[in-house]
């Protein structure tokens, strides 16, 4: 019997108590109330599910409508363990002082809002300028589940590292920002390119076409080819069809033992069975930059999805840097801090630049 429960957990509402009652005086913005699920894809395209936290309607006996609500004490405890990276920015700056910061950023839900149509997940010009500003002072990488070319088309910054397909397609900057070379540790002239899953391209392409055919009957579904992995989006699918979609995808993948299935935010991910993930990409990039084995590096990884947890765990195991989860609801995470949405990510990046330019004075004022 298919276990759908695990596939719904990331979209379920996990906090149902007023945050003000649990804050104890700390500065943490209130969580948004759950939004109603939109079943028509055209209607959904005009709305943004900012947190992926809408109520989850279910196929009876399969996908649960809500996760168990947390108590005020549980919410308070979660916030103690994962405070706002903005409210506690001075602590972040103190931990990074005297060390070389390296910035890793997820794309969807981190630099851009989560939208119904993944092809319209545009980042704002203000966010692009914030990322460009960070890249002038710190080595900066985009680590995304997207195809590397697609995420580059969204970001449009040549001075960054890009790790697409959940880190399975990596390439270095094609241009340098004014101060970027000063921070680069890779050998001059060396092109950083790495594709650990290249042998899987034929089978991934085959499965892509099979899934396109199988999903054709499910209105609102979208199969995205991310080169070294595939994504089946169901954000625009009627909730009554979620179980059907899940079953069809699983039936296809069962015939391909070299592939595995995982869950993102209203998306099913198909990836090669290979010991490589976003955490592996983070380690590879740090090594490429010459930081392997050094204790004066401070990696900062910001992401919103469960696939980013691999990177958060790597940082915890290293005992260096911090992971920041972008979320509006409490959830299990290895990240140390939180930000609520892309606008807060933008503000955090701007603050990083300020302390680089102004030192401790950058902590004062907006």
Swiss-Prot record:
The keyword Membrane does not apply. InterPro entries: HAD-like_sf, HAD-SF_hydro_IIB, HAD_sf, OTSB-like, Trehalose_PPase. GO terms for molecular function: trehalose-phosphatase activity. Coiled coil: none annotated. One of its GO terms (biological process) is trehalose biosynthetic process. It catalyses: alpha,alpha-trehalose 6-phosphate + H2O = alpha,alpha-trehalose + phosphate. Its EC number is 3.1.3.12. Transmembrane segments: none annotated. Pathway: Glycan biosynthesis; trehalose biosynthesis. It comes from the Eukaryota. The keyword Plastid does not apply. Its cofactor is a divalent metal cation. Keywords: Hydrolase, Stress response. Belongs to the trehalose phosphatase family. NCBIfam families: HAD-SF-IIB (TIGR01484), T6PP (TIGR00685). Removes the phosphate from trehalose 6-phosphate to produce free trehalose. Trehalose accumulation in plant may improve abiotic stress tolerance. This is Probable trehalose-phosphate phosphatase 3. The gene is TPP3.
